Design a protein with these regions (language model features):
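Divalent metal-coordination and catalytic microenvironments
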Residues: 9, 24, 29, 49, ...
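Histidine-rich, glycine-flanked metal-binding segment
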Residues: 1-5, 10-55, 462-465
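Short, well-structured alpha-helical segments that form the helix of a local strand-helix-strand
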Residues: 344-352, 421-429, 444
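Active-site neighborhoods of metal-dependent hydrolases
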Residues: 115, 121-122, 126, 130-141, ...
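C-terminal cap of metal-dependent C-N hydrolases
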Residues: 9, 286-292, 372-379, 385-387, ...
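Acidic, glycine-enriched loop/beta-strand segments at the rims
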Residues: 12-23, 333, 358-365, 369-371, ...
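Hydrophobic, small-residue-rich alpha-helical packing segments that form membrane-like cores
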Residues: 92-217
Length: 504
């Protein structure tokens, strides 16, 4: 007897093939049979010809620490995400003082019993900080060797690759040659290199050149993170150049793919607007520099020069002090005016200081034409750049945390026709699974883990928006993780059947 039988479903198997009407049987957490399946089951679900797909795989998340604080991961499960890869943008939880080894961190995640499957990369910024702190100095040969050893250890203990965050300290202090040597440490393990590039604005093309160079010289697969152009003057121009560069690299044998989130706004920490040199010595050193009048004047000048016409596009998404709650959902320009016409850079710096760097932003900087052009490429997959959150998360976090995958399907595939439905599902399931190296997930096929999403296409809607992000998406009927029903009609069942995934 099967544990579960889902009958009469339009099965989209994740390969890109047209849907077929059939049944899926589940036994011991895995798919036991697909097609016209006979036999009894402990639980039978009549899909009513709704669509059944593999669970969605988020190749670019930041759930590392959040999965320990919010193991039920409503923001993931309620949009159909069953597997989540953290450690992106150069930042991972391990190795650190709290978790000296990746094995320590992954063991802690297992103890937390998450509702989703959890995998991770090791962050170059985290590695560099462990060896050099927040030093702007060029790494010595000995320091690079230490970084390589820590990277290799993380891979031995289950990481799937390495990431960089080249706009964030301390990753941004690295030379290209340092990156080549440290990234190469994942090569013997078949790991991949995911990069938040040095510049996604006016120097986007140069940044892609560097990413391609690092991957080629290091001998690894490349994942360009959240590919986009944030320079308005280069909209509908730069990404056509970079996509052509990627296509050419692929023809020449370099295994490079991209991910993106389907929104015209990004999100990050408010302190990303502080010039990177101010972080030398760490966050506390940066906060002290913001309080020094002479240093602050220089920072103000540099920040305003690089933000011409942009302060009005940057909104406070969350902060914690009670006296500043009124700022959430308002732009830096609005806040500056409310404070009596204050300089916008000073306004930003004062918020960072008041919140001790615990403040986030949403930044509107991309155009729809670029989003769709990138999305249409066969080597691009969705990645939320979000994290595991509850429906009671504070502030106004970016809606990508809660709605990326449903928006991809409902708005861009169904409504806009950017990708056929079966292709869109492939890009959300088997494409990231193969990229990461998950041989037993991403397809509806006998022997695969039963991560499944049942949805009603006509009712799919990414309800989470910038004004009210903390909500479930419409149209997701059921979500199974390793064969266990974990979400149903917008509600979490309480199940916590996720697994910690380690590189094998």
């Amino acid at each position: 007897m099967y544990d579960l039988m889902i009958k009469n479903a339009r099965i989209i198997d994740g390969t890109g093939a047209p849907w077929t009407l059939g049944d899926v049987a589940v036994q011991d957490g895995k798919i036991a049979a697909v097609g016209s399946v006979s036999g009894a089951a402990k639980a039978v679900v009549d899909a009513g010809q709704r669509y059944l797909t593999p669970g969605f795989i988020d190749i670019h998340s930041h759930s590392d620490g959040e999965i320990l604080r919010c193991p039920t991961a409503e923001s993931r499960i309620l949009q159909g995400v069953t597997t989540d890869v953290g450690g992106n943008c150069g930042s991972s939880v391990a190795p650190s003082e709290q978790y000296p080894a990746m094995a320590d961190y992954l063991a802690q995640v297992e103890q937390a019993r998450p509702s989703i499957n959890s995998a991770t990369l090791v962050g170059h910024g985290t590695i560099r900080n462990a060896v050099m702190g927040y030093s702007r100095a060029e790494a010595t040969a000995q320091e690079i060797e230490q970084m390589r050893k820590l990277t290799a250890q993380a891979m031995e203990e289950g990481a799937y690759g390495i990431s960089t965050g080249l706009i964030y300290p301390p990753s941004c202090y690295s030379t290209t040659e340092e990156l080549v040597q440290v990234v190469n440490a994942v090569q013997p393990y078949g790991g991949y290199y995911a990069t938040h590039m040095r510049n996604e604005s006016y120097d986007l093309v140069k940044s892609v050149e560097e990413a391609l160079h690092v991957a080629k010289e290091a001998g690894v697969r490349l994942q360009i993170s959240h590919h986009k152009c944030t320079c308005k003057a280069d909209w509908q121009v730069s990404v056509k150049t970079t996509i052509a560069m990627i296509q050419r690299a692929r023809r020449q044998g370099l295994d490079v793919t991209c991910d993106q989130y389907p929104y015209s706004a990004s999100a990050t920490s408010m302190s990303s607007n502080v010039p990177a040199w101010a972080f030398e010595g760490g966050v506390e050193a940066m906060l002290q520099r913001l309080q020094d009048p002479e240093t602050r004047a220089r920072l103000r000048e540099e920040s305003n020069a690089s933000h011409v016409g942009r302060w009005g596009d940057i909104y406070v998404s969350y902060l914690y002090s009670p006296e500043n709650q009124w700022m959430i959902g308002k732009s830096i320009t609005e806040i500056a005016e409310k404070l009596g016409g204050k300089d916008p850079a000073d306004t930003c710096f004062d918020i960072v200081l008041a919140e001790k760097d615990h403040v986030g932003e949403v930044n509107f900087g991309m155009c729809e034409e670029d989003i769709e052009y990138i999305m249409a490429q066969p080597f691009v997959m969705p990645g939320s750049d979000g994290e595991a959150k509850g429906l009671d998360a504070p502030g106004k976090p970016h809606p990508r945390n809660y709605g990326t995958f449903v928006r991809y399907l409902a708005h861009y595939s169904r409504d806009r026709g950017v990708l056929p439905l079966e292709t869109a599902v492939q890009h959300m399931t088997s494409l990231p699974a193969s990229r990461i190296g998950l041989a037993d997930r991403g397809l509806i096929k006998a022997g695969m883990w039963a991560d499944l999403v049942l949805f009603e296409l006509e009712k799919l809607k990414d309800d989470p928006d910038y004004g009210n992000p903390q909500q479930a998406c419409s149209g997701i009927c059921q979500v199974y993780v390793n064969g266990v029903l974990t979400a149903e009609n917008g509600r979490h069942t309480g199940a916590r059947a996720g697994q910690v995934l380690r590189r094998k």
